[in-house]
Curated annotation (Swiss-Prot):
It comes from Human herpesvirus 2 (strain 333) (HHV-2). This is Virion host shutoff protein. Gene3D superfamilies: 5'-nuclease. Keywords: Decay of host mRNAs by virus, Endonuclease, Eukaryotic host gene expression shutoff by virus, Host gene expression shutoff by virus, Host mRNA suppression by virus, Host-virus interaction, Hydrolase, Inhibition of host innate immune response by virus, Interferon antiviral system evasion, Late protein, Nuclease, RNA-binding, Viral immunoevasion, Virion. SUPFAM superfamilies: PIN domain-like (SSF88723). One of its GO terms (molecular function) is endonuclease activity. It is found in: Virion. GO terms for cellular component: virion component. The record marks 215 as: Necessary for the endonuclease activity. Residues 110-130, 288-307, 334-371 are annotated as: Disordered. One of its GO terms (biological process) is symbiont-mediated degradation of host mRNA.
Length: 492
């Protein structure tokens, strides 16, 4: 999933940066968690170590491991899942739904040119009461005494004889959500939205500082992502780092790399990041250019400047060949190009400060051995918050100017998806105000008796259940109320 080839490109070009993500003392850093993406990664890691664990036991083991790290690093997770909190909602919005709806409407490329390119309105843009959240339980609602729920669907049909098989992932979805809710963690009922889309909404409404996921399509939606929280310095990818490296604006980035989205292009019809850049005759910055960019970042660290105005698209020329001219102009004038300093949450001293050459393979001083005055962290944190507020993506609708009129099914799918992303992340003007609707956040009252009941009901071995419960009580203390965390992080 994501943008095909983006992760490899980011690693190769040193765009994966390691950061401490240490907020000032007394603060929690809010982070959206694409729960199934993260849990699948952990399940693959741990289920081979514990082959005797059943689905619920391995799920709880991964959950305990994840919650312990969140507590250690003062991260405040807001969990986001596909198909709602009951794992039963059909997904009718997002990339997969757009592809399915478009291919059902158009059988041939000739039909695509006559079809409306607008996607259906999402719950975020719908002015009516959102039907996507109609099944949400009220805060503090407990499960019925006999409510055992149903387990997530098992693995699909077995692979043909002789075909390479992947190990079945032992992840109990509904059990995982119920434990998190009983422990009092904040969550989003994505309803009929994909989890990626809900995470992007939390990021662009300045609710979270990062999205914890390995899906690079969040970068296409303008988000900064965290790849792994278990390491000392956390590997991250900033969307603005990509834009500065590519020498392009966000609308250009969205319109160009939508071709790489794997969910929009079935049967390997997507383009890779390298292929798209090669078609545009893009060349990577030299080391001297990277050093100059780093010096500009340091010189401009106290004053953020706006990105240069885009050249208007030539009238009557709506093919992707115009990208070659645009990028050639930007590369030719790169000595005069002034990047904004990168936006990132407060980092710790001793971490990689040179944004141009930082690498995920660097040997860094462990964060716990680095002493930074709290006053310095507070100042850096305030600078980060001010920068995030100034850099709201207002120009996302300009991406449509860089797309040709859809003449094929693939182009129609891309056009609809770009419009859909714009509806998710671009604020709307309401008189003197610019507003972006945030999805509702829910947080049930912590009920340790309920959590214990859920665990012991599904994990029948008493010793295993007791061990996991002891880990939960030790490493997953009662989380703060999400409104207090967000107010302190963004408003103080």
């Amino acid at each position: 999933m994501g943008l095909f080839g983006m992760m490899k490109f980011a690693q190769t070009h040193h765009l994966v940066k390691r950061r401490g993500l240490r907020a000032p003392e007394g603060y929690f850093t809010p982070i959206a968690v694409d729960l199934w993406n993260v849990m699948y990664t952990l399940v693959v890691k741990y289920q081979r170590r514990y082959p005797s664990y059943d689905r619920e036991a391995i799920t709880l083991h991964c959950l305990c491991s994840m919650l312990r790290v969140f507590t250690q690093k003062s991260l405040f997770p807001i969990f986001v899942t596909d198909r709602g909190v009951e794992c039963t909602e059909p997904v009718v919005f997002g990339a997969k739904a757009i592809l399915a709806r478009t291919t059902a409407q158009c059988r041939t490329d000739e039909e695509a040119s006559d079809v409306d390119a607008s996607p259906p309105p999402s719950p975020i843009t719908d002015s009516r009461p959102s039907f996507a959240f109609s099944n949400m339980r009220r805060r503090g609602h407990a499960f019925a005494p006999g409510d055992r729920g149903t387990r997530a669907a098992g693995p699909g049909p077995a692979a043909p004889w002789g075909a390479p098989s992947k190990p079945a992932l032992r992840l109990a979805h509904l059990f995982c959500i119920r434990v998190l809710r009983a422990l009092g963690y904040a969550y989003i009922n994505s309803g009929q939205l994909e989890a990626d889309d809900a995470c992007a909404n939390l990021y662009h409404t300045n609710t979270v500082a990062y999205v914890h996921t390995t899906d690079t399509d969040l970068l296409l939606m303008g988000c900064d992502i965290v790849l792994d929280i278990s390491t000392g310095y956390i590997p991250t990818i900033h969307c603005r780092d990509l834009l500065q490296y590519f020498k392009m604006s966000y609308p250009q980035f969205l319109a160009l790399f939508v071709r790489c989205h794997t969910d929009l292009h079935p049967n390997n019809t997507y383009a890779s990041v390298e292929d798209v850049l090669r078609e545009c005759h893009w060349t990577a910055p030299s080391r001297s250019q990277a050093r100059r960019a780093a010096r500009r970042e340091r010189a401009n660290s106290r004053s953020l400047e706006s990105m240069p105005t885009l050249t208007a698209a030539p009238v009557g020329l709506e093919t992707r060949i115009s990208w070659t001219e645009i990028l050639a102009q930007q590369i030719a004038g790169e000595d005069d190009y002034e990047e904004d300093p990168p936006l990132q949450p407060p980092d710790v001293a001793g971490g990689p400060r040179d944004g141009a050459r930082s690498s995920s393979s660097e040997i860094l001083t462990p964060p716990e051995l680095v002493q930074v005055p709290n006053a310095q962290r507070v100042a850096e944190h305030r600078g980060y918050v001010a920068g995030r507020r100034r850099h709201v993506i207002h120009d996302a609708p300009e991406a449509l100017d860089w797309l040709p009129d859809p003449m094929t099914i693939a182009e129609l799918v891309e056009h609809r998806y770009v419009k859909y992303v714009i509806s998710l992340i671009s604020p709307k003007e309401r008189g003197p105000w610019t507003l972006l609707k945030r999805l509702p956040i829910y947080q049930d009252l912590r009920d340790e008796d309920l959590a214990r009941s859920i665990v012991t009901r599904h994990i029948t071995a008493p010793d295993i259940a007791d061990r996991f419960l002891a880990q939960l009580w030790a490493h997953a203390p009662p989380p703060a109320f999400y409104k207090d965390v967000l107010a302190k992080f963004w408003d103080e």
